[in-house]
């Protein structure tokens, strides 16, 4: 997730800013498509990584004793690799092979113009890439993370009840045995730490969704009904998504 945000900040945002400020593209057709590919790659990798993190937390919460054996470091590396492969197949392959290209006159003119880098896509690519890059991971992420919070909440309630009964029945023993009190405090601190981590991940996922959902809604609408969404709105919402890369380090 950090790598995707870093690449977005170093390789996508500066060229995007130059494109808007100068109102033209100064880096040629090849770099236009390569830059666009990196853009789609980073967005796809970001949300799919968040989706994988949600599944990881779900397994950690629901099957804590099996977690270490189920998710080893090698398996984690394979999953991360798969995320970037899928992201590459969604971005670089169709863009570099020109499968994404629209056939209307305005789009064709832009493709042949060295100073134009507007992202004109055909309907099939716009909808398919939005589904693979955003909507499917979003649905999985929301469903899994809602389950994670439900399970975590129930576990915290059980721990609170257990500690309450323990203190009520064995207060004098706890006072005499420092080790028992230390064990309870350690258990409570661990649960609070896990709960805080879940809240932080929830904020990251929520921020990402709020930043990118408007753009992907507009992206699909634009693919179905051309000229319905003003270009300025499209660019503004795209930059709202870019801003998300600056939020994660702060969160």
Curated annotation (Swiss-Prot):
Superkingdom of the organism of origin: Eukaryota
Lipidation (S-palmitoyl cysteine): 191
A single GO molecular function term of this UniProt record: beta2-adrenergic receptor activity
InterPro entries: ADRB2_rcpt (IPR000332), GPCR_Rhodpsn (IPR000276), GPCR_Rhodpsn_7TM (IPR017452)
Disulfide bonds: 32-117, 110-116
TM spans (from-to): 1-21, 33-55, 77-100, 123-146, 201-224, 232-251
Pfam families: 7tm_1
Subunit structure: Binds NHERF1 and GPRASP1. Interacts with ARRB1 and ARRB2. Interacts with SRC. Interacts with USP20 and USP33. Interacts with VHL; the interaction, which is increased on hydroxylation of ADRB2, ubiquitinates ADRB2 leading to its degradation. Interacts with EGLN3; the interaction hydroxylates ADRB2 facilitating VHL-E3 ligase-mediated ubiquitination. Interacts (via PDZ-binding motif) with SNX27 (via PDZ domain); the interaction is required when endocytosed to prevent degradation in lysosomes and promote recycling to the plasma membrane. Interacts with CNIH4. Interacts with ARRDC3.
Protein name from the UniProt record: Beta-2 adrenergic receptor
Native organism: Meriones unguiculatus
Recorded name of the encoding gene: ADRB2
């Amino acid at each position: 997730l950090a790598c995707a945000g870093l690449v977005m900040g170093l390789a996508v945002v500066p060229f995007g800013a130059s494109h808007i400020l100068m109102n033209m593209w100064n880096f040629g057709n090849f770099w236009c498509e390569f830059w666009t590919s990196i853009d789609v790659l980073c967005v796809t990798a970001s949300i799919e990584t968040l989706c994988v993190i949600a599944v990881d937390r779900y397994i950690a919460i629901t099957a804590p004793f099996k977690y270490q054996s189920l998710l080893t470091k090698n398996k984690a590396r394979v999953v991360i690799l798969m995320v970037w492969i899928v992201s590459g197949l969604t971005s670089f392959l169709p863009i570099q092979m020109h499968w994404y290209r629209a056939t209307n006159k305005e789009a064709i003119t832009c493709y042949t113009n060295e100073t134009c880098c507007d992202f004109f896509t055909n309907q099939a690519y716009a909808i398919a890439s939005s589904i693979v890059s955003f909507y499917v991971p979003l649905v999985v992420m929301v469903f899994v993370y809602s389950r994670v919070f439900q399970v975590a909440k129930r576990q915290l309630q059980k721990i609170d009840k257990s500690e309450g009964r323990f203190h009520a029945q064995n207060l004098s023993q706890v006072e005499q045995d420092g080790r028992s009190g230390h064990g309870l405090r350690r258990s409570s601190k661990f649960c609070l730490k896990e709960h805080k981590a879940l809240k932080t991940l929830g904020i990251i996922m929520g921020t990402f969704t709020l930043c990118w959902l408007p753009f992907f809604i507009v992206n699909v609408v634009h693919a179905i009904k051309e000229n319905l969404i003003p270009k300025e709105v499209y660019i503004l919402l795209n930059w709202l998504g870019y801003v998300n890369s600056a939020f994660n380090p702060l969160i």
